[in-house]
């Protein structure tokens, strides 16, 4: 069989994961979001009431800017060259994460391949969904959902987002 959680054995008491055969586990789909949340937790513990934390494009906010206005963030238009704003959102005690392959891909023999791997096939995703942005209460959740939605493709992702009332 191919990749998948069914090939792993989780031992919570030992904080261990075992596998009968070599497996590659990539946590990059939540790593930046986790880092943002860790910094936000620290700022909360220090009594900082208003902040914007950003790591590699993943963001979490709390409170308002010093001038009293909401934190406003641009969502980029997914274009390979240059930068352009697609839309602007105001966040208050929320997180936002984006996943996409419009800049992070590789080419081989004239074929373009996404850096995102489909867990069902073990191969790069094959659809042309360029970018997904998700807003959630915490950044690790937003990061994981954005990556998952990117893997799913537009129709499945929007169906799930609509059913679960997830801003995407």
List the model feature ranges, each with a label:
Residues 1-168:
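Mature catalytic core of soluble alpha/beta enzymes
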